[in-house]
Amino acid sequence: RLNGNSIYDQPYGDRNEFPCPDRLGSCTMTDEDYRSTRKGQSLEVFDNLYEAKQHLNFKPQLPSGLEGLRSVHVSIVDHDVLQVVYAYHELLKGTYFDRVDDMPKYIKYRVSTLSGNIAGDYKDYLPQKTEVVNDIIVTYRMVDDFVYLASWEHGGQNHVFLFNEPVSVERAREMINSVGTN
């Protein structure tokens, strides 16, 4: 479980929450945008997904069946956005990491029945790409040819994946396909 000062404990739009990825030329956010995303937001942290689900008024669709994906932080933002931070590493064997090379990548997943931008990420991106994955329209925000953010709506729920290290479109597709009600 991450401590209370973690970036994962911050609600929407914290300037330090989503640093500009390498190789990204345009990454801006105005003070006005920043202030408007920070008004009166709450964040409630839970010990596990089961506990968090009891506090939602919907049954969230979540990623499952992906090798090496472990939830490390669970919270609800503004009472109706479930946020799960996953640690991911190809060689993840357990909870502890022996070498710096073994440090995981972090993936933030948010799901809600709210429409609109639930990512909390308001920077400008070039390029943006849209594709259809299993009859679902997915929008990617890209860094070079890699995905930094993927968002889509399905089954009355709004979904977002944010990757602290951009991933291939194929990997993003695999993760999107893993999301279902469980």
Describe the role of every protein-language-model region.
Residues 2-155:
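Short, solvent-exposed recognition patches
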Residues 155-182:
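Surface-exposed amphipathic alpha-helical segments
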